[in-house]
UniProtKB/Swiss-Prot annotation:
This is Outer-membrane lipoprotein carrier protein. Participates in the translocation of lipoproteins from the inner membrane to the outer membrane. Only forms a complex with a lipoprotein if the residue after the N-terminal Cys is not an aspartate (The Asp acts as a targeting signal to indicate that the lipoprotein should stay in the inner membrane). Belongs to the LolA family. InterPro entries: LolA/LolB/LppX (IPR029046), OM_lipoprot_carrier_LolA-like (IPR004564), OM_lipoprot_carrier_LolA_Pbac (IPR018323). The keyword Repressor does not apply. Monomer. GO terms for cellular component: periplasmic space. It is found in: Periplasm. It holds the Pfam family LolA. Residues 1-19 form the signal peptide. One of its GO terms (biological process) is lipoprotein transport. Keywords: Chaperone, Periplasm, Protein transport, Signal, Transport. It comes from Helicobacter pylori (strain ATCC 700392 / 26695).
Amino acid sequence: MRAFLKILMVLIFMSVAYAKNPSTLSKEEEVLQHLQSFSAHFKQVLKNEKPLVYYGVLKAKAPNWALWVYEKPLKKEIYMNDKEVVIYEPNLFQATITPLKDKTDFFTILKRLKKQDDGSFKTTINKTTYRLVFKDGKPFSLEFKDGMNNLVTITFSQAEINPTIANEIFVFKPKDENIDIVRQ
């Protein structure tokens, strides 16, 4: 009986060790686990009565930096770090600086994702559910409902995993000294 219990304990230990073995992770889970930086072009669709479509470039770097540069239909830059969000709207000559109350930066979302049976990844942060879909081993689309219950779908193209990105690009530096800076 003792020998049986010892063998059983060894088998249980091995099964737990195997379950924790990183080699059992899917390719997508490996990408998320080792993601330190991300760069991609994006198409953002806000689905409401009249869908709005935006195009731009995202650059993000761990632990929590992100730069969203909207190019069409209006130019806008969004700088995020662990403390604040800066929204720069060059057409309005204005930058709005808001303290970041909730950890909803790009990397916090990615780190909390859990694989679903359909192969997508989901997480819920502050009553917002995020769903990420991979294509060809890279993040392809991110969906969530915004504060006004509109479905937002961001589709990534030309995605790069762990590119070299300089920290300086995540710091807002006014390009024009005549802009208004609004602190909220």
